[in-house]
From Swiss-Prot:
Keywords carried by this UniProt record: Methylation, Ribonucleoprotein, Ribosomal protein, RNA-binding, rRNA-binding
Name this polypeptide is given: Large ribosomal subunit protein uL3
One Pfam family cited in the UniProt record for this chain: Ribosomal_L3
Species name: Cupriavidus necator (strain ATCC 17699 / DSM 428 / KCTC 22496 / NCIMB 10442 / H16 / Stanier 337)
Modified residues (N5-methylglutamine): 153
The encoding gene: rplC
Gene Ontology cellular component list: cytosolic large ribosomal subunit
């Protein structure tokens, strides 16, 4: 994983290009990502940078975590994440420092990871886009049922992975190869072309795209 930023999904809006084209964008606030620890091969077995984002009341911070953050000289945040980096990049960073939007540039391809909106218990039509039954013509009380879930006495069981009703959403998902349409360095905002996972105020992780195609 490359060095990235932890941010907050503000919401969606649209911006206009110089040609007058409207582009739907998601606004991501990537305020101060405070460096809490630099991990190295010698001390931890791998190289990474650990960062915290947001704010948390002191009464909500455990004593071990408070000591860990005090060692780095940073305030407690809502979330702590780490990014795997190489030794050369780790040498440029230090605990107590911060990361900002200058890690990215306009037009760059990125991956955005977040927790999708929870939909609760959902049927197969909403969950897997099954077709509903006929409204009339002999159909009664079977309009939204999934239909048969198995065969006969042989095999006499429902195969694992059968698509059925159940919990929908509230899972971690990554959308790849999104494009940064605009950067507001003063307000520490990334305007990402398209939609990203999660609800408003949800925490997201922004990293350089791992499958970005080289420009011809």
């Amino acid at each position: 994983m490359s060095l990235g930023l932890v941010g907050r999904k503000v919401g969606m809006t649209r911006i206009f290009t110089d040609d007058g084209e409207a582009i739907p964008v998601t606004v991501v606030e990537v305020g101060d990502n405070r460096v809490t620890q630099i991990k190295t091969d010698e001390t931890d077995g791998y190289t990474a940078v650990q960062v915290t984002f947001g704010a948390r009341r002191a009464s909500r911070v455990t004593k071990p975590l408070a000591g860990h953050l005090a060692k780095a000289g940073v305030e407690a945040g809502e979330i702590i994440r780490e990014f795997r980096i190489d030794a050369a990049k780790a040498a440029e960073l230090q605990a107590g420092g911060s990361l900002s939007v200058d890690l990215f540039e306009v037009g760059q391809k990125i991956d955005v990871q977040g927790v999708t909106i929870g939909k609760g218990y959902a049927g197969t039509i909403k969950r897997y886009h099954f077709a509903s039954g006929r409204a009339t013509h002999g159909n009664s009380r079977s309009h939204n049922v999934p239909g048969s879930i198995g065969m006969a006495q042989d095999p006499g069981r429902v195969f694992p992975g059968k698509r059925m009703t159940g919990h929908l959403g509230d899972v971690t998902r990554t959308v790849q190869n999104l494009e940064i349409a605009k950067i507001d360095a003063e307000r520490k905002l990334l305007l990402v072309k398209g939609a990203i996972p999660g609800s408003k105020n949800g925490k997201v992780i922004v990293t350089p795209a791992v499958k970005a195609k080289a420009k011809a």
